[in-house]
Amino acid sequence: MRIIITGGGTGGHIYPALAFLKYLEKVEPDTEVLYIGTKKGLEAKIVPQAGIKLKTVDIQGLRRSLSPQNLKTAYKFFKSVSDAKKIMKEFKPDVVLGTGGYVAGPVVYAAAQLKIPTIIHEGNSFPGITNRFLAKKVDRIAVGFHAAEQYFPASKTTFTGNPRAQEVADAAAQVEKFEEPTVVIFGGSRGALKLNNAFIEALPELAQRSFKTVYASGEIYYDDYKETFNQYKENSNLDIRPYINNMTELLAKSQLFLGRSGSTTIAEVTALGLPAVYVPSPNVTADQQTKNAQEYVDQGAAIIIKDEDLTGQTLVEAISNILENNEKYQEMQAASLKAGVPDASQRLYNLVKEISK
């Protein structure tokens, strides 16, 4: 198979694509892969590091308000469509897969015009503007949240979950749990100021509880709190770090997650059957993180603390109410396991094969 994958800007569009490619390499080792992104997006760094060939087009996002910049965006869109067609005529893909982000717009659009089989993967519960635009033009639509199905034509939409779920589930298969109940608190790669402030407030209480806390402040914040953190460095209940490098292994060993509710994070957490306390970021388009988390609250696998309601007290209470209540913990764990999709890449692969024949 020859496949072009496109998607970028943020990790939520890129990591699922890379997870799928990892699976594809395993089931079809002879697959030829080309990734199309932008020079400015996160993909420009991450994709080559993964050993995948990258080509770029020059495109920018559409402003949601009236702006002269949108004229420039329109010009760049059609120029990128033309550039993408040239790349495809040279590469001759059997299928083109878009995982979201504005770069996927012109690339998948170009593929559809060339009558190349196309599929998009929507990772969030509320679709982004690019995938909403592409929905009528593609052959298949894969979604990572059941809530997203309502926004797309039912005849070509399939729930597959997020490919990161299968990557995490496979990697964690042989990992043993910590002996003591453990919660991982993580505000993302850069950290989250509101979460840090609540954690500092909660430290005296967390130091005395019956569970262990692993906390990552984010590297840019760590030095600001280092003096306070050092006061607790001998406390066996607390493991405080600037960043968590081995997140998959750590989550697999733990019993509970507390943090933001990006689509990839939720896929990883549910693939492992972990209950979760989500604190949706208020700085995300269309309040996507709240919508993402709500689907799993409705299924009994998680609870939400609004960012504005997050304090040291609400943080400790939320964790304690789950980890120190065995019946509730087991109910949430079962719900999380049921909601998880540990075969997400296989499901997406089945769709790809279906349209590339």
Curated annotation (Swiss-Prot):
Pathway: Cell wall biogenesis; peptidoglycan biosynthesis. Keywords: Cell cycle, Cell division, Cell membrane, Cell shape, Cell wall biogenesis/degradation, Glycosyltransferase, Membrane, Peptidoglycan synthesis, Transferase. Its main location: membrane. It catalyses: Mur2Ac(oyl-L-Ala-gamma-D-Glu-L-Lys-D-Ala-D-Ala)-di-trans,octa-cis-undecaprenyl diphosphate + UDP-N-acetyl-alpha-D-glucosamine = beta-D-GlcNAc-(1->4)-Mur2Ac(oyl-L-Ala-gamma-D-Glu-L-Lys-D-Ala-D-Ala)-di-trans,octa-cis-undecaprenyl diphosphate + UDP + H(+). It is a peripheral membrane protein. GO terms for cellular component: plasma membrane. One of its GO terms (biological process) is lipid glycosylation. It is an enzyme of class 2 (transferase). It is found in: Cell membrane. Pfam families: Glyco_tran_28_C (PF04101), Glyco_transf_28 (PF03033). The keyword Hydrolase does not apply. UDP-N-acetyl-alpha-D-glucosamine binds at T10, G11, G12, N124, S189, I244, Q289. GO terms for molecular function: undecaprenyldiphospho-muramoylpentapeptide beta-N-acetylglucosaminyltransferase activity. Disulfide bonds: none annotated. Its EC number is 2.4.1.227. Cell wall formation. Catalyzes the transfer of a GlcNAc subunit on undecaprenyl-pyrophosphoryl-MurNAc-pentapeptide (lipid intermediate I) to form undecaprenyl-pyrophosphoryl-MurNAc-(pentapeptide)GlcNAc (lipid intermediate II). Belongs to the glycosyltransferase 28 family. MurG subfamily. PANTHER family: GLYCOSYLTRANSFERASE, UDP-N-ACETYLGLUCOSAMINE--N-ACETYLMURAMYL-(PENTAPEPTIDE) PYROPHOSPHORYL-UNDECAPRENOL N-ACETYLGLUCOSAMINE TRANSFERASE 1. This is UDP-N-acetylglucosamine--N-acetylmuramyl-(pentapeptide) pyrophosphoryl-undecaprenol N-acetylglucosamine transferase. It comes from Lactococcus lactis subsp. lactis (strain IL1403). The lineage of its organism: Bacteria, Bacillati, Bacillota, Bacilli, Lactobacillales.
